[in-house]
UniProtKB/Swiss-Prot annotation:
CDD domains: Ribosomal_L29_HIP. GO terms for cellular component: cytosolic large ribosomal subunit. PANTHER family: 60S RIBOSOMAL PROTEIN L35/50S RIBOSOMAL PROTEIN L29 (PTHR10916), LARGE RIBOSOMAL SUBUNIT PROTEIN UL29C (PTHR10916:SF0). One of its GO terms (biological process) is translation. Belongs to the universal ribosomal protein uL29 family. It comes from the Bacteria. This is Large ribosomal subunit protein uL29. It comes from Saccharopolyspora erythraea (strain ATCC 11635 / DSM 40517 / JCM 4748 / NBRC 13426 / NCIMB 8594 / NRRL 2338). Keywords: Ribonucleoprotein, Ribosomal protein.
Length: 80
């Protein structure tokens, strides 16, 4: 995960995969903050990238909750 994840890539994930990705990103952010506090963080930009990834995940989850977009699982069920 050197670069951020695009919204298009996240929209292709199922709901449970999205929750897992959110959990991983939050853990990474925690570790980065810890490294920052101890002076071990080499790439400060990574903090910003991970925070934005988390925001993208929350946005996509909210879109699905409001019915603005359909999860890939729902699209497959409707087509079948």
């Amino acid at each position: 995960m050197a670069a951020g994840v695009t919204a298009t890539e996240l929209r292709e994930l199922a709901d449970d995969e999205l929750v897992q990705k959110l959990k991983e990103s939050k853990e990474e952010l925690f570790n980065l903050r810890f490294q920052m506090a101890t002076g071990q963080l080499e790439n400060n930009r990574r903090l910003r990238v991970v925070r934005r990834d988390i925001a993208r995940i929350y946005t996509i989850m909210r879109e699905r909750e409001l019915g603005l977009t359909v999860s890939p699982e729902g699209a497959e069920e409707g087509a079948a």
